[in-house]
Amino acid sequence: MKDVVALVTGGSRGVGRGVALALLAEGATVHVTGRTMTEVEAKAHPQGSGSLEGLQAEAASLRGRLVVYRCDHGVDAQTEAVVREVGRGRRLDIVVNNAWPGYEHMVEDEEFTWIQPFWQQPTWRWNAMIDVGLRSAFVTARAAAPIMVEHKRGLIINISFWAAELFNGNVIYGVAKAAANKMASDFAHDLKPHNVAALALYPGLVRTEAVMRAAEFFDLSNSESPQFIGRVVAGLWRDPDLMEKSGKVHVAAQLAQDYGLSDIDDFKPRPLTASDIV
């Protein structure tokens, strides 16, 4: 993937960081956004770790080229400025819409507040998931699409989850992910004449910093590394039938099986189904 240019939003930690590392390992040029630039700043973050500076250090030995941007995706102008900067190279092949502050403060005063009923949910959680997570996916894609349309090839991925279809512990989460799926589907409709794909991708349970901070609340036996999702993204880009997958929802672990991919520890996660979520 040495000639591939990707943009991953929200990559200082979690799934975004893993996607970036996996694509860099494949030799791609990867542009990554995040609010947390330094490790000093990371210590003050609700998740306590993960920075663009740390990503740079981890990526130093990988084949690809990493470009990082401090960006608050709650500010449209910052999102648009990043895409303009990426577009100066007149190429953008892959966009992974992953920016997502909705997992912050999942545990407060040793209580897992994320699963409280909707009438006990704070408004800031709506703002994080909808006004930042969902909105920034639209703003990023809107800015990136003209570059892809010009080149007659591209891939836009909205990171989503089963909560789009089934109750998964948090009403706001379900609303945000359902909208992410619909957005990807409708993106695909508009982009199809231009040979640009858009789809929603469901990770399984990913061992992100937030999940590991609340590890006692999760069964990690079938969990995935953050890099696993990136391997699937690379598989999608190589797929000669990518346009047939456009507009649809895909489970990352199922695609990994189809592509013959495994996780970084050679584990092959079992694809989750609706029955696992229920």
Task: Give the label of every model feature segment.
Residues M1-R90, P101-M106, E110-P117, W124-R125:
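Short-chain dehydrogenase/reductase
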